[in-house]
């Protein structure tokens, strides 16, 4: 008799996705981040659920309810800090996952890649709205500044901003709707992640060499289940180290001051994982231009597959492209640093140069270097 895991309508879906899935035999630890993102999402939904049981989305009580969670709820402090730092771990995994896709040419799976970009936008929106909920100074002013960017849209901008606010400023209506969206979006992310996986399993995974691996596949379980468990252990170790030893390391001290519309903090800045985009936004002295650059800094990923001019899929055997890739990584780290600095000399010019370099590398240098490498292959 055939095993139930291969015949049962529900179990066979799990079997074909996580047990008997034919997987390339040579995928490295860089392929762990997909499963780690799944773990992050589950952790965030669970901790978020328990936080939502005690949180109140009202301007008068939101800040106090978060303090109440940390002080009075059993293990509320660890749930709150796991949720806050879990977001940071989520973005670390996201950036490494996207970086892996760029390096090894995984973007050639168009559907998987494009759904991944939609996922990235959705996670960023969710994280932004979550940051508003504690209703500290940085929550309030961050929400004010970022939602105000929509006013740069010609003709409908101002109406759009007031529609999102639910009034003439960030207030009770804004907080309530942000809480509602912050609660529902992770489930949309889970659905999108399932579709992401569905499209990936249509083609099978890429591998470091970028060469089709149909002739050399191994079952996902036990080889990669054990590898993923090891990755998960590292993830949880890092998360717990962060949440238990330095929970406020990545946060902003201003957010321990209750929101005050009459007092603007000296430096308004988002969480660290948005700083690179924030630096690109600030580097353009025009409001609409800055907003467009901000959106394009992520949306540029959509055209990466169209700009793939190399004869090889992966960068594994392309040293010039590798140099360019690591220059891009250094550039993004520079942008992240600049995003957290005040708007003054020399940070302004560094930010502008780093922003230009970011787009030049992705849109001009990468395709050009790939063509040069193709010609070098003929020698």
Curated annotation (Swiss-Prot):
Pfam families, per database record: Cytochrom_B_C, Cytochrome_B
Transmembrane helix listed as a keyword: yes
Subcellular locations according to the entry: Mitochondrion inner membrane
Gene Ontology biological process terms from the UniProt entry: mitochondrial electron transport, ubiquinol to cytochrome c
Gene Ontology MF term list: metal ion binding; ubiquinol-cytochrome-c reductase activity
Cellular component per GO, a single term: respiratory chain complex III
Cofactor: how bound: Binds 2 heme b groups non-covalently.
InterPro entries per the UniProt record, alphabetical: Cyt_b/b6_C, Cyt_b/b6_C_sf, Cyt_b/b6_N, Cytb/b6-like_sf, Cytochrome_b, Cytochrome_b_C_euk/bac, Cytochrome_b_N_euk/bac, Di-haem_cyt_TM
Binding site for heme b b562: 83, 182
Taxonomy, superkingdom: Eukaryota
Subunit details: The cytochrome bc1 complex contains 11 subunits: 3 respiratory subunits (MT-CYB, CYC1 and UQCRFS1), 2 core proteins (UQCRC1 and UQCRC2) and 6 low-molecular weight proteins (UQCRH/QCR6, UQCRB/QCR7, UQCRQ/QCR8, UQCR10/QCR9, UQCR11/QCR10 and a cleavage product of UQCRFS1). This cytochrome bc1 complex then forms a dimer.
Family membership: Belongs to the cytochrome b family.
Misc: Heme 1 (or BL or b562) is low-potential and absorbs at about 562 nm, and heme 2 (or BH or b566) is high-potential and absorbs at about 566 nm.
PANTHER family in UniProt: CYTOCHROME B
Name this polypeptide is given: Cytochrome b
